[in-house]
Amino acid sequence: ATLAGAKRLAPEKSRNVSVGLVAAPAPRLHLSLDAYQIEIRHRIIGSGTLSGAGADAAIVAHGSVLDPSITDATVSYLTNGVDTRTRGLDASGDYATDFGDAGKVKWTAGWNVNKNRITNVTLAGGLNPASASPIIDATPKNKLILNARYLNGAWNGNLRATRYGVTELTVADGDTGGAPYHTNHIDPTVIVDLESGYDVTAHLTLSAGAKNLLNRHPDKAISQGYSHAYVYPSFSPFGINGAYYYVKGSYTF
């Protein structure tokens, strides 16, 4: 990898700053707000795909034999390529309600908004779009969680709705390993999870539920590659498999 331009890795260094507020403005109501900033120096990233004489020399030095029919060999390696900064806000709240014989419900909400930025690039040749995108785009710009936890005697239930904001990832072309680059885009999506359980004894609980109850999938990948084996983008924050239903039992000692 040194022949292709790689250098010995240095440790990443980070500096975190946060400030928070906590309040209980009413009985059974709790609120919190946190602001944070995370700076990472010498962040380790992938170099992206490199080609040319340096790439060919690196492959040969590794002990591999290049097929003479191959005209465009590529290599990639890990490197301390960038400095980054993440700024965000976390807000949360919970409220408890008592409906008497009808049971109790604890309502909770959580919200996050964040922005990632590359503040310095030390990678020789700079960053291509496919190397920069995982750092600044591949996590949701915001996320909202609403949850209701129900308790009534031996019965319990939980309903959760999670809204993921826009998520994107720019990838290299599946045929060239570089340009033209393609940006896979996942629109804001709400995922609903539901579970109901019953305490058979003081130790045994039986439950049934669903993850991703509404069977939501991310937008299909633009560049699917490998004979369209990758239909959905793997960076989806809520997975690619759709709904999952289950029955389970748990025993505590």
Where do the language-model regions lie?
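Residues that define the transmembrane beta-barrel architecture of outer-membrane proteins
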Residues: 3, 13-17, 85-89, 140-144, ...
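Residues on the lipid-exposed face of transmembrane beta-strands in outer-membrane beta-barrel proteins
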Residues: 19-23, 91-95, 109, 146-150, ...
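Gram-negative outer-membrane beta-barrel transporters
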Residues: 29-30, 35-173
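Outer-membrane beta-barrel strand-turn architecture
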Residues: 13, 23-27, 39, 85, ...
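Solvent-exposed loop/turn elements at secondary-structure boundaries
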Residues: 1-12, 17, 27-35, 39
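Extracellular loop and loop/strand-boundary signature of outer-membrane beta-barrel proteins
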Residues: 4-7, 75-80, 129-135, 177-184, ...
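C-terminal beta-signal and adjacent terminal beta-strands/loops
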Residues: 115, 161-173, 198-253
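Generic long, charged, amphipathic alpha-helical segments
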Residues: 158-163, 170-191, 195
